[in-house]
Amino acid sequence: MNSGLSRLGIALLAAMFAPALLAADLEKLDVAALPGDRVELKLQFDEPVAAPRGYTIEQPARIALDLPGVQNKLGTKNRELSVGNTRSVTVVEAKDRTRLIINLTALSSYTTRVEGNNLFVVVGNSPAGASVASAAPVKASPAPASYAQPIKPKPYVPAGRAIRNIDFQRGEKGEGNVVIDLSDPTLSPDIQEQGGKIRLDFAKTQLPDALRVRLDVKDFATPVQFVNASAQSDRTSITIEPSGLYDYLVYQTDNRLTVSIKPMTTEDAERRKKDNFAYTGEKLSLNFQDIDVRSVLQLIADFTDLNLVASDTVQGNITLRLQNVPWDQALDLVLKTKGLDKRKLGNVLLVAPADEIAARERQELEAQKQIAELAPLRRELIQVNYAKAADIAKLFQSVTSDGGQEGKEGGRGSITVDDRTNSIIAYQPQERLDELRRIVSQLDIPVRQVMIEARIVEANVGYDKSLGVRWGGAYHKGNWSGYGKDGNIGIKDEDGMNCGPIAGSCTFPTTGTSKSPSPFVDLGAKDATSGIGIGFITDNIILDLQLSAMEKTGNGEIVSQPKVVTSDKETAKILKGSEVPYQEASSSGATSTSFKEAALSLEVTPQITPDNRIIVEVKVTKDAPDYQNMLNGVPPINKNEVNAKILVNDGETIVIGGVFSNEQSKSVEKVPFLGELPYLGRLFRRDTVTDRKNELLVFLTPRIMNNQAIAIGR
């Protein structure tokens, strides 16, 4: 009994002194516009208060300030402002604190200061030179990191909202940090993770030409492989391509936005998958026994400042206990428990049974279909400039058909193509005409062109050496006598026959045939370029010796450079050469002349990728007739051919193929036994040395032609 009275007394004392714990009262809220599109909120209390703790939310854009020990005495919870960047202010009192929520049009920075019983909140950037009360900046010690070189030391940055620089750094723990310098700290990207890539989209933000590059950061040994920056119209996109398992964090300090990608283990990835949560709403707690479901929906709507429309069929009670649960998850739990569904239109939340919502949407679709079937037909001529009108018309009919049978409009209207003017004549309802114009505007664009330049380099070096000897002689019973005539010096026998001092060749100086036998050792150098002959004569014997030598060197280089321009995904071919004729015999014995092509040709099919790289299917041939090795008057064809499919950057030169051949040979022809004798064997053999080197290289350089280059080319 006494213990029960004690607990009751403690409860009464707590109830009596609970209001005293909230020492300060918020009595007044004033708003004033400041220069530089800034807004000042002045909060007046009945006594001094401590500095608030706050945070910002990006979507929806808002600033939240927590005022500990403060009661709301304003008499209202919501107040519309519509001053500068601020839309409204919401003051919510919970337990021992009061939360001030400032709803913004776009996320902006803010500062706070306390002066006596007043708290000032300034929303917006401070003007240059203004003094803003804030904590003194602390200079952090730089952590050791590996830095990628900036793309350009001082890139040109356009005025307004723009990206100033993009850099890459490697952190201490192997994480890859993509550092983006912004011209305005209020720039906020839309971040998406799709297809294993992290994409940051900056709306109404310019990107200097110097920063529109693709960074290859594989060598930094981080999960990041590439960082690609591009711009289209007034939108800038930065795509980060990591590999393997990773986790990323995005944070911003002043004008610097950092995307940190760190590697993950398999265990971390499994844990992250389990912890992945689809609900992001502000957390709340609900604890009710047998409460009307409409009341729960009203509580959630009040908590989120949403307008609620509930169907009359939403009925029944529910018991729930939820602690620190996101409000959107709590709403889904309530709806699923009672078989309900929701539709959100702006800031209005519509709740009804799932069957009722589905039936209503089916009725709306049927009504729209009936309206479309009764819509008047209009005729319009749409000019197509670059594409084929027939292709676009066929594509339009296929994408707007129902199951490939008939059009959405039940076969009403017609699509006709005029090939002469490359135009589409459409007789369709206005809705389909608008859709046709959108398709034409997206598909009727100039085809990009590519110039392909190939270089075929042939280099050869040759060296030939030959050294040989010839022995010969003649025997005569009589005596020899000498002669000299027409520059020839030799000997003459008794019969008047002449023998010159060439091994074994006894001939008349001008006419006649040889009388002596052939040389008994004929190992002279082939195609000799020099030689020396020695003769030994007795009364009836002549002995001749001829030493001959040949040495030949040579080198050459042939460079062929074909070029061709073609459209994206179109095949082009250029050919230069000749056709070699040759005779063919038929089974009947008749002959006919045929031709074999021997030419230099380049055949390519380029494909431009979305990141301005080029996939090239290429075939390069260089055939030439070999007239030095003709057979039956027909030269063979020396063929050089390369077939490849490669991926290359715009303007980059790549070697797509090469052949190197080295031919070395050494041969010795000699007289058995005599050719093996030391020293003397040199007089009975012929040595030949050959060394030839040939190299073929094929280079390819594709370049994407812009509109200006095409105009100059014309």
Swiss-Prot record:
One of its GO terms (biological process) is type IV pilus assembly. Its main location: membrane. Keywords: Cell outer membrane, Fimbrium biogenesis, Membrane, Protein transport, Signal, Transport. One of its GO terms (cellular component) is cell outer membrane. Residues 1-24 form the signal peptide. InterPro entries: AMIN_dom (IPR021731), GspD/PilQ (IPR001775), NolW-like (IPR005644), NolW-like_sf (IPR038591), Pilus_4_PilQ (IPR013355), Secretin/TonB_short_N (IPR011662), T2SS/T3SS_dom (IPR004846), T2SS_GspD_CS (IPR004845). It is found in: Cell outer membrane. PROSITE patterns: T2SP_D (PS00875). SMART domains: STN (SM00965). Pfam families: AMIN, Secretin, Secretin_N, STN. The keyword Iron does not apply. It comes from the Bacteria. Gene3D superfamilies: 2.60.40.3470, 3.30.1370.120, 3.30.1370.130. PANTHER family: DNA UTILIZATION PROTEIN HOFQ, PROTEIN TRANSPORT PROTEIN HOFQ. Belongs to the bacterial secretin family. PilQ subfamily. Essential for the formation of pili. Involved in the biogenesis of type 4 fimbriae probably by serving as a 'porthole' allowing passage of the fimbrae through the outer membrane. This is Fimbrial assembly protein PilQ. The gene is pilQ.
